[in-house]
Amino acid sequence: MKSPEDLTKFYMHGTGHWLGLDVHDVGVKLINDEFREFKSGMVTTVEPGIYIRKDDKIESKYWGIGVRIEDDVLVTEAGNHVLSKKAVKDINEIEYLMSQR
């Protein structure tokens, strides 16, 4: 990536969302134009990703590829607890897991 615009070209979503009664639970991120403070008991996701669309000016062999790796994080009094810490994230482990389908 060569410019800030490249980031939005391949990363057209936020970095996460609330988790609760639903996978994409409701809740505001801003209160009075300030980012909401995390409080113990809240659960959020951290999910960077990249998506390569067909209209991008890159080699066609990469068109249609999308990858997003998500962690689910519980906010605690002491900081946080990554609920998904045992989820497979290494590329070799992911490829092995997908080959078993």
Provide a role label for each language-model segment.
Residues 1, 5-12:
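Internal maturation/activation junctions in enzymes
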Residues 8, 15-101:
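Charged, cofactor-coupling segments
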